Structures are given as structure tokens and as C-alpha cells.
Amino acid sequence: MNLNSIPAFDDNYIWVLNDEAGRCLIVDPGDAEPVLNAISANNWQPEAIFLTHHHHDHVGGVKELVEKFPQIVVYGPQETQDKGTTQVVKDGETAFVLGHEFSVIATPGHTLGHICYFSKPYLFCGDTLFSGGCGRLFEGTPSQMYQSIKKLSALPDDTLVCCAHEYTLSNMKFALSILPHDLSINDYYRKVKELRAKNQITLPVILKNERQINVFLRTEDIDLINVINEETLLKQPEERFAWLRSKKDRF
């Protein structure tokens, strides 16, 4: 399968997987126009849409795409049932698309019903996990989001993390504010800065590498623990995650 990213709005990415026959899967189409343009340019035949959550910048293009291609099956969590979803899926279930099984993983936090889709090596994680960061907590709690990204972090090392936004540069600036002397974070920041200066995408990222540079995945790391302990003594990784998320919200 071939992985494609379609830029949308200011910083969204709509992901598309296509097979050799030209059948394709579209993930979180917040805007139909760039997707329709890509379909036309590549002669794709849309088979399915995956929705991760109900926010408009992830579902806004569904109606127009389905009107154009009525054969599309739209998979999504319960919270997207009024956004065009025709097949509601939940944690532990699978979606069989393009000849591959995609596992559905519940990841509450950004929204309460947020889900992700995984078929090795592809992880479509919506607004749960970003390179260098994680999603804002619009509906869920820090505890829920901590457990959600912990689940994703446990996936295989070679997982390709397909996030829905280009937030990497700002996330790495935050990471540097927390761990300014970390070599991995500094190296990755320089790489990301160069890519963004050329207006190039920083995604997808390999999960093994992401674990090294994403402070939200390093809540049991001694360097991070020492930094946090300078301000407040937090014994549990979950508490340290909440501390980081609060810092990031004000960054």
C-alpha cells in the first residue's frame, strides 16, 4: 500500500492509503476539495473513510465525498454517528479495508469518544498523539489521555505514526523548554526546523524515535522526573503527564 498526505486548512493532514488497484482509504477528511483533487489526479477509487473523532476539521468533507462516491463505507466512533458514519466501531473491533484488518483502539482524552486505527505499520491517531506532543483535552481528563497515549506507545517500534496536524515544530520548542540539554530532542528540533523552513511535512514519524523525543511519552524518564521535582514532587507518571499537559496549555 502507498501512504499519502493531503494538506488541508492551516495545518491539517488528511491521510490516504491506496493499493495497487487504485482503491483508497481516506482518514479524517475535514475538507472534501483537496481530497477530490487528489482522487482525480491519481485516478483513485475511494472504498472507505476512517473518522477518529467528531471535530469539524476531521469530518467536514464526509458528506460531499459520499455524495460523489456513494459506495464509500464511513467508519467512526459513536460520537461521529451524526457526521456521516455508516459503520460505528469501538475498541477491540476491526475494520477490514483494502484487504487489511485495522484494529480499533479507544483513545479518550482529546474527545471522550476518540478512536485510532492500526494496521501494521500504519497508525492513524487523529488528535491523540502528535510528533513531540499530544492532543489538547477538550473533553477528557489527563488520566484518560495518559492511558490513551500509553496504549499507543506500546505498539511495535516500526509503527508509522500518522498524526492529523503539523504541530511538530511548536511541540519541539516546548520539549526544549522542558529538557533543553537533551541530545535527541535538540537533534530532532534542528531536523524539524529545517523541514518546516522548506515547508516540508514532518510526518509520519517512527514510533521508536518518537518515544525518545516526545516528553509526554517519557514520564518515567529520570531526566524528566528530575526537572519536574525541581518544581513539585509528583510520584506517579500520570501526575507528571498532567503537569506537562498543563505546562503545554500555557506555553
From Swiss-Prot:
Transmembrane segments: none annotated. GO terms for biological process: methylglyoxal catabolic process to D-lactate via S-lactoyl-glutathione. The keyword Nucleus does not apply. SMART domains: Lactamase_B. Belongs to the metallo-beta-lactamase superfamily. Glyoxalase II family. Thiolesterase that catalyzes the hydrolysis of S-D-lactoyl-glutathione to form glutathione and D-lactic acid. This is Hydroxyacylglutathione hydrolase.
